[in-house]
């Protein structure tokens, strides 16, 4: 019976090990080695009692909760150099005994808050060589108290869970090198008393905030837990913000300065402390005074220079710091925007620029001009308040709403789309901030506002509707008469005018086409006359030279300079070949056809010009085409 029992035990042991893997039973622990096996997923028949599971150098793409279910005794899990792109929620939920987790060399781009939940006793977490761009703030929460080594190097991280990392009291090694980190929160390493190695090489750090952790690396013998700090390969900005680091005197490091230009490329520890300087802020330009209508957007600008770049703040008229809200936005570049201005937004704003070298301030005044509303009156009570266009120019012409001593508003130089509004100040009155023009047309009842500076006494209205009636009123905006008013408005006068109708293009087209037709006709006659005159001169000159009728060119033979040419042979007379109707041979013979050809040429030229310009005339104005045709016939 012994041999069959032995075979059964061997068979059961072989079935517990996945086919492509190698299983080693070393005393009480079981190791499953599945590296370099070409696996596409975690083998489902791995012994649940496995203590060490190596799945490195395969092609596994995703991890899920069933892959490691009930492996409560697993201590070491290696998944390095696979193609893992996704880790499901609580994939390691049953690995309560796990001490070491290697996920380096994969294709992870993100770790969620529940991706690493489960291994509460994890001590070594290796995530280097991935494509991580984000790690959720709570990703490390399950093993904050137990983690000793954390490696997230060679990724694309701009931020890491600083709050979680700063709460790891047992952390010994932290590798953050070769990422895109550009800032460290102040005091983030203050609680890491056991940290012995911090690697920040090749990031984008321009400055480092003072931290007690860095002083432990200055004297390794005196420090109870010396720190090995590396931060070379960063674009350090060597100014007063890094003076504390320069005083640590670390002669073995090879950091260099990237800026300012005067220190660029110099060895960090060789720069004298006196050259680590800053420049106080200087307000380069800012908005001094801004006037806006009630309800409009207000943009206050403030620009400051300094080293380092100043931080910008705004203080409102109520001496409170202006922050981002549903109505206002304060941008880092010093711009303050108020979306919809109201009466309470008016006042003096203060722009504050600060940096470690000092601060600078600038005052910006915002004036909010209240829109005219029906029923408003100024503090004096005797003058009309903000105008409503409903009290039209017709009412104003009857003497309602204007004072006789005030000059009337005039609209002159009216065209189809524009009109010039003119006015005067008349007798001395309250100081005027600016003028406001209100108008609307019979085509559109929408009220249009125009703001004009106080120094102007005329304004050109553009983009008016042709052939429309307009009502226009002019108001003067003056300083507030009382503490509760923002502006006081005074009606200067109203006017009524009408724009001209749209001008037809027919007359312009007639003049253009008629002028072109006449030019072509006269040109044709001149060319024909010149051609006839030239032919006549040639005929007369040849006849006077020979004293006889000129021979036709077809009866003349050419001769060379080499010898005598043979006498022309006599031929019986023959009738000349027929000539084309539209050609004239200058053979010094019968020239009667040339005169006719010249006249036909002039007529054809005139008819061609008529076909071009006459078509336009026919399409635009038929009467002009007929007159042009009669003109061509009379001229030709």
From Swiss-Prot:
Expressed, tissue-wise, as follows: Expressed in brain and testis. In the brain, weak, but broad expression in the cerebral cortex and diencephalic nuclei. Also detected in other parts of the central nervous system, including the olfactory bulb, pons, cerebellum, and medulla oblongata, as well as in the peripheral nervous system, such as the ganglia of cranial nerves and the dorsal root ganglion during gestation.
What UniProt keywords are attached to this protein's entry? Answer: Disulfide bond, Glycoprotein, Immunoglobulin domain, Leucine-rich repeat, Membrane, Phosphoprotein, Repeat, Signal, Transmembrane, Transmembrane helix
- Which InterPro entries does the UniProt entry name for this protein? Cys-rich_flank_reg_C (IPR000483), FN3_dom (IPR003961), FN3_sf (IPR036116), Ig-like_dom (IPR007110), Ig-like_dom_sf (IPR036179), Ig-like_fold (IPR013783), Ig_I-set (IPR013098), Ig_sub (IPR003599)
Q: How is it modified after translation?
A: Glycosylated.
Gene Ontology annotations of biological process type: regulation of postsynaptic density assembly; regulation of presynapse assembly; synaptic membrane adhesion
- Domain Ig-like: start-end pairs: 281-367
**Residues covered by the LRRCT domain:** 234-280
Query: Which parts of the chain does the record assign to the membrane side Cytoplasmic?
Result: 540-636
Q: Where does this one sit in the cell?
A: Membrane
Cite the LRRNT domain residue spans from the record. Answer: 17-48
Pfam families, per this entry? fn3 (PF00041), I-set (PF07679), LRR_1 (PF00560), LRR_8 (PF13855)
Per the record, membrane topology reads:
Single-pass type I membrane protein
Is-annotated flag, keyword Lyase? no
Write out the transmembrane intervals.
519-539
* The record's note on its domains: The PDZ-binding motif is required for neurite outgrowth promotion. This motif is also involved in DLG1-, DLG3- and DLG4-binding.
Q: Which family does it belong to?
A: Belongs to the LRFN family.
Subunit comment: Can form heteromeric complexes with LRFN1, LRFN2, LRFN3 and LRFN5. Unable to form homophilic interactions across cell junctions. Interacts with DLG1, DLG2 and DLG3. Also interacts with DLG4.
Protein name as annotated: Leucine-rich repeat and fibronectin type-III domain-containing protein 4
């Amino acid at each position: 019976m012994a041999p069959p029992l032995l075979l059964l035990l061997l068979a059961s042991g072989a079935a517990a090990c996945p086919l492509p893997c190698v299983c080693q039973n070393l005393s009480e622990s079981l190791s499953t080695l599945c590296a370099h096996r070409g696996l596409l997923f975690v083998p489902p028949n791995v012994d649940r009692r496995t203590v060490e599971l190596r799945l490195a150098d395969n092609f596994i793409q995703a991890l899920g909760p069933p892959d490691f279910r009930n492996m409560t005794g697993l201590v070491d899990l290696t998944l390095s150099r696979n193609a893992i792109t996704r880790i499901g929620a609580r994939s390691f939920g049953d690995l309560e005994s796990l001490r070491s987790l290697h996920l380096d060399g994969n294709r992870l781009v993100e770790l969620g808050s529940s991706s690493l939940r489960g291994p509460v006793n994890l001590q070594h977490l290796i995530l280097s060589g991935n494509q991580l761009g984000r790690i959720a703030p709570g990703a490390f929460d399950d093993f904050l108290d137990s983690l000793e080594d954390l490696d997230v190097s060679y990724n694309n991280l701009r931020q890491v869970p600083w709050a979680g990392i700063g709460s790891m009291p047992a952390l010994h090694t932290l590798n953050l090198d070769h990422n895109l980190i550009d800032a460290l929160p102040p005091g983030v390493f203050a609680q890491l008393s056991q940290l012995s190695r911090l690697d920040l090489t090749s990031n984008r750090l321009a400055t480092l905030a003072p931290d007690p952790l860095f002083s432990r690396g200055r004297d390794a013998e005196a420090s109870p837990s010396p720190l090995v700090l590396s931060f070379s390969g960063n674009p350090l900005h060597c100014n007063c913000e890094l003076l504390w680091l320069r005083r640590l005197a670390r002669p073995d490091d090879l950091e260099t300065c990237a800026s300012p230009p005067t220190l660029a490329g110099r060895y960090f520890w060789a720069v004298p402390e006196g050259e680590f300087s800053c420049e106080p802020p200087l307000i380069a330009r800012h908005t001094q005074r801004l006037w806006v209508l009630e309800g409009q957007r207000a943009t206050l600008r403030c620009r400051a220079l300094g080293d380092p770049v100043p931080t910008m703040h705004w203080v409102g008229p109520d001496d409170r710091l202006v922050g981002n809200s549903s109505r206002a936005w304060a941008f880092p570049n010093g711009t303050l925007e108020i979306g919809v201005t109201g009466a309470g937004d008016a006042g003096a704003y203060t722009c504050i620029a600060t940096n470690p070298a000092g601060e600078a301030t600038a005052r910006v005044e915002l004036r909010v001009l209240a829109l005219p509303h029906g029923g408003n009156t100024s503090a004096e009570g005797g003058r009309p308040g903000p105008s409503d266009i409903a009290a039209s120019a017709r009412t104003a012409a009857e003497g309602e709403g204007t004072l006789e001593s005030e000059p009337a508003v005039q609209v002159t130089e009216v065209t189809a789309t524009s009109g010039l509004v003119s006015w005067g100040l008349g007798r001395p009155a309250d100081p005027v901030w600016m003028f406001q023009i209100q108008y609307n047309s019979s085509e559109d009842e929408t009220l249009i506002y125009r703001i004009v500076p106080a120094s102007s006494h005329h304004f050109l209205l553009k983009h008016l509707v042709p052939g429309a009636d307009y009502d226009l009123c002019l108001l003067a905006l003056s300083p507030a008469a009382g503490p509760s008013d923002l502006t006081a408005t005074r009606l200067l006068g109203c006017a009524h005018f009408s724009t001209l109708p749209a001008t037809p293009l027919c007359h312009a087209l007639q003049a253009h086409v008629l002028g072109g037709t006449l030019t072509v006709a006269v040109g044709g006659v001149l060319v024909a006359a010149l051609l006839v005159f030239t032919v006549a001169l040639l005929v007369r000159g040849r006849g006077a030279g020979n004293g006889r009728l000129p021979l036709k060119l077809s009866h003349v033979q050419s001769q060379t300079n080499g010898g005598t040419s043979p006498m022309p042979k006599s031929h019986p007379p023959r009738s000349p070949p027929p000539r084309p109707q539209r050609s004239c041979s200058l053979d010094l013979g019968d020239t009667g056809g040339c005169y006719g050809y010249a006249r036909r040429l002039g007529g054809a030229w005139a008819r061609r010009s008529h076909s071009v310009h006459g078509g336009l005339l026919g399409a635009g104005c038929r009467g002009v085409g007929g007159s042009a045709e009669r003109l061509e016939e009379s001229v030709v």
